[in-house]
Amino acid sequence: MKKKALLPLLLGVMVFLAGCDYSKPENRDGFFYNTFYVPMDNVIHWLGTSFNNDYGLAIVVLVLVIRIVLLPFMLSNYKNSHMMREKMKVAKPDIDAIQEKVKRSRTQEEKMAANSEMMEVYKKYDMNPMKSMLGCLPILIQMPIIMGLFFVLKYPSSGGFTEHPYFLWFNLAKPDIWITIIAGILYFLQAYVSSKSMPAEQRQMGYMMMVISPIMIVWISFSSVSALGLYWSVSAAFLIVQTQVANMYYSKLAQREVAPMIEAMEKNKAEASGKGKNTQVVSKKNKKK
């Protein structure tokens, strides 16, 4: 549900990024411009001059620094997501039974009683729904920072990479088809890697992002300076590695931590099954007598 809710939010941000125009001097004012654009522009200029006017390297370093600063939030999100998924496998029979009660309930009191039972199940399996909801936090934290960097690259101030534009094979101040294609491919791969770790019921949304993200990235990059394509390429490459490594590590960690719960559940099932068989045997003996 959380990921489905984020899809329209992300699409809205894409439209916002495409639609805002800081190319005109009279538009360069306001809260967002002064709070996020100006500081990011100053950082880009400082890094560029520090690297002997290599503004391509400055963009790469700045993107990596931002991603590393946000890494603890993202890792916490990965961990909570995997732990919740593994615990849901154990708690699913209890949760399904309570959800059935909610469907059958006719009064508000019955619904409240069922919801109370659900909270007890969450407590029993040490599941905190709030942690899942807080998974949106890293995205919300990084959004104004990333948007500030986006506008600095899309609408550069005088000097900077407009005067020192060359990096690798392309001109940072002009569109470049190859860096645009690279950015599109990397965002497709990033969405694909993310979708692999999603539950089956959410995977369709992941497949939608595999199509929508590259199209939006290519569309915006193709009509913008290639500095923007460089930013997206570096960011996507970092996210691919981050997602793959985090999913591998936290998936195994969650399985190890939840394994005792699964063993206890299987043991309880076996004991219940054994008691049921014993009851049937005793019942048959009594009938024979």
UniProtKB/Swiss-Prot annotation:
One GO BP on record is: protein insertion into membrane
Signal peptide boundaries: 1-19
> What is the protein's membrane topology class?
Multi-pass membrane protein
Q: Where is the lipid attached (S-diacylglycerol cysteine)?
A: C20
Instruction: Identify the stretch(es) annotated as Disordered.
Output: 269-289
Cellular component terms (Gene Ontology) = plasma membrane
Q: Indicate the transmembrane segments per the record.
A: 55-75, 133-153, 166-186, 210-230
**Which cell locations does it reside in?**
Cell membrane
Supply the alphabetized keyword list: Cell membrane, Chaperone, Lipoprotein, Membrane, Palmitate, Protein transport, Signal, Transmembrane, Transmembrane helix, Transport
Q: Where is the lipid attached (N-palmitoyl cysteine)?
A: C20
Q: Main location per UniProt?
A: membrane
InterPro entries per record: YidC/ALB3/OXA1/COX18, YidC/Oxa/ALB_C, YidC/YidC1/YidC2_Firmicutes, YidC_ALB_C
Q: Does the keyword Transmembrane apply?
A: yes
Q: Which GO molecular function, any one, fits this protein according to its record? A: membrane insertase activity
Report the sequence similarity comment from the record.
Answer: Belongs to the OXA1/ALB3/YidC family. Type 2 subfamily.
Query: What HAMAP family does the record point to?
Result: YidC_type2
Its biological function?
A: Required for the insertion and/or proper folding and/or complex formation of integral membrane proteins into the membrane. Involved in integration of membrane proteins that insert both dependently and independently of the Sec translocase complex, as well as at least some lipoproteins.
Q: What is this protein called?
A: Membrane protein insertase YidC
State the organism named in the record.
Answer: Staphylococcus saprophyticus subsp. saprophyticus (strain ATCC 15305 / DSM 20229 / NCIMB 8711 / NCTC 7292 / S-41)
- This chain is encoded by the gene named yidC
